[in-house]
Amino acid sequence: MAAKRVEAKDYKKAAATLVDAFFDDPVCVYLCHTTNEQQFKKLMTEMFEYIVYAHIIRGLVLEVGDFAGISLWMGPGNNMDDWYSILRSGLWRLKYKLDGEGRKRFFNEFLPILNDTKADVLKERDDHSWYLVYVGVSSKEQGKGYLRKLIEPIFNICDQEGLPIYLESSHLHNRPIYEHFGFVYQQSIYLTRDNQKVPLEIMIREPETESKAEQSAKPKAALSKTVSASIAEKVEGSLAVSSTPVC
């Protein structure tokens, strides 16, 4: 079963999977800033719908197992917080959905620290990298190998193009999982507008050389030919303008 690209008409399906996968995520709890579970789920749903749609516009959204798992990617030189993406995706509406503290956490703390840290860690490679923004599998579908199918197609592209992959992990127990796939811990950052700091672990996967890839016995995940061609076009287009990020 190969991963498939998510189209705009299915953005709500993709968002629902991520809401289920990240329902107890400490960063999501921190950003939504509410103790009402019904309100929390509503805010999470709206937040992920905006974020998924922004990635459909500017990046790449993959699903596997009939939306059992979802991964959100930004290719070289792209991001979701330019004005075009904010307006088209509806992300601006979060300013009116979150309370005053939630707005400060999301727009004044969360987005800036993510952008600044990524630029600081990757340096001149910031516009020459892939960004794994979110990857999640529905709680009822875990343990079926969906994670590998959601990330390895981009691994293969990055190995061919010599590009690193960057991510932030919001759960400490995820580090060994990502390390299994070749990511290396770099540093931790913290969201600090609460009594207890919320950590995020920065990790990078460097591209494998051809000889190392040939020696690897792990099976390679695949996409359909149509989707693979589409991703290849995105990579080529991003690299062509990688020195000038889309904004």
Curated annotation (Swiss-Prot):
Domain N-acetyltransferase positions: 70-205
Enzyme Commission number? 2.3.1.-
Mention one GO molecular function.
N-acetyltransferase activity
Q: What is its main location?
A: endoplasmic reticulum
Highest taxon, organism lineage: Eukaryota
The record's annotation in InterPro entries points to:
Acyl_CoA_acyltransferase, GNAT_dom, Trichothecene_AcTrans
Answer whether the UniProt record assigns the keyword Lyase to this protein.
no
Keyword terms of this UniProt record = Acyltransferase, Endoplasmic reticulum, Golgi apparatus, Transferase, Vacuole
The answer to whether keyword Magnesium applies is no
Q: Where in the cell is it found?
A: Endoplasmic reticulum; Golgi apparatus; Vacuole
Similarity section: Belongs to the acetyltransferase family.
> What is the recorded name of this protein?
Uncharacterized N-acetyltransferase C550.08
